[in-house]
């Protein structure tokens, strides 16, 4: 199992001068960590910009710096190299790109201003657009993989369902924090153990990239409701999962505060 990735994810020095922020380096590190966590090999793409412009280049758009026959010829050769890798190894899980890049952008790219359009536009960069059949994911999206699973855990059926959801998420390369695996599965605990569990799960909530909350029943579990509220206050995305057909009211599936926070 492997991914193709923009080479600057592994070697940030390949980027244009002055554009790399600490937050970018953090995203790159998290991406590498996710791949290591799930045993995914990272195969770097060639860097058309570095090969054409050399190291230490200034930032620029495609139209400003790369819109030449020589660069087009280089991209044809590099496309053939990458296609040969895919033919030999099979399709990758995805390409991990870097948004805004003139060559490796995923959903945004600095193509250049023309015909009244701004220099930055939607779409893939000119190199990633050579591989339309391969799914592409921006590094900022790929780096978000830590999930906190908020759910009631008081019955065997609930714990079994929680485990199945965690397993499903794990097969899609998400690292799941499941409170019931931290010891929160029994009423036989003292005050110190309760404090430990609270602080442990609170810390996991703070570290998570997003929360999946199971909100079954006519009235959602109070602990799950607290976890959803805390996550929302931290500005973290909350995804509510519900298989129950019961509703709390005509306009609401569940309590409106939970529904609107997810």
Question: What is the predicted role of each segment?
Answer:
Residues 1-3, 145-146:
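Extreme N-terminal starter segment of soluble prokaryotic enzymes
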Residues 21-39, 124, 165-170:
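Short catalytic helix/loop segments, enriched in acidic residues and glycine
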Residues 40-59, 141-143, 177-185:
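Short connector loops at secondary-structure junctions
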Residues 53-89, 117-144:
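Divalent-metal-activated hydrolytic enzyme cores
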Residues 64-107, 219-243:
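Mid-chain, well-packed structural core segment of small domains
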Residues 104-131, 223-232:
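Short Gly/Thr/Asp-enriched flexible loops that form oxyanion-binding sites at enzyme active sites
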Residues 139-262:
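Conserved catalytic or regulatory cores that recognize and/or transform ribose-phosphate-containing ligands
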């Amino acid at each position: 199992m492997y991914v193709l990735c923009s080479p600057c994810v592994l070697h940030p020095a390949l980027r244009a001068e002055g554009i790399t922020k600490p937050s970018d380096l953090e995203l790159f590190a998290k991406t590498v960590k996710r791949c290591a966590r799930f045993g995914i090999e990272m195969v770097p793409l060639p860097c058309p910009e570095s090969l054409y412009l050399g190291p230490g280049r200034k930032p620029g758009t495609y139209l400003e710096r790369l819109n030449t026959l020589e660069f087009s010829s280089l991209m044809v050769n590099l496309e053939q190299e990458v296609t040969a890798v895919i033919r030999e190894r099979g399709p990758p899980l995805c390409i991990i790109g870097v948004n805004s890049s003139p060559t490796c952008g995923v959903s945004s790219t600095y193509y250049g201003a023309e015909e009244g359009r701004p220099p930055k536009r939607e779409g893939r960069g000119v190199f990633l657009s050579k591989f339309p059949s391969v799914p592409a994911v921006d590094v900022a999206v790929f780096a978000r993989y830590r999930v906190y699973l908020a759910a009631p855990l008081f019955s065997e059926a609930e714990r079994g369902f929680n485990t199945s959801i965690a397993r499903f998420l794990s097969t899609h390369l998400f690292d799941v924090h499941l409170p019931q695996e931290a010891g929160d599965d029994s009423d036989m605990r003292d005050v110190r153990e309760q404090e430990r569990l609270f602080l442990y799960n609170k810390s996991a909530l703070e570290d998570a990239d997003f929360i999946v909350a199971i909100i079954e029943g006519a009235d959602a579990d109070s602990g799950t409701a607290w976890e959803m509220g805390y996550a929302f206050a931290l500005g973290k995305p909350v995804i509510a999962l519900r298989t129950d057909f019961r509703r709390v009211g005509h306009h609401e599936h569940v309590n409106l505060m939970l529904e609107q926070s997810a």
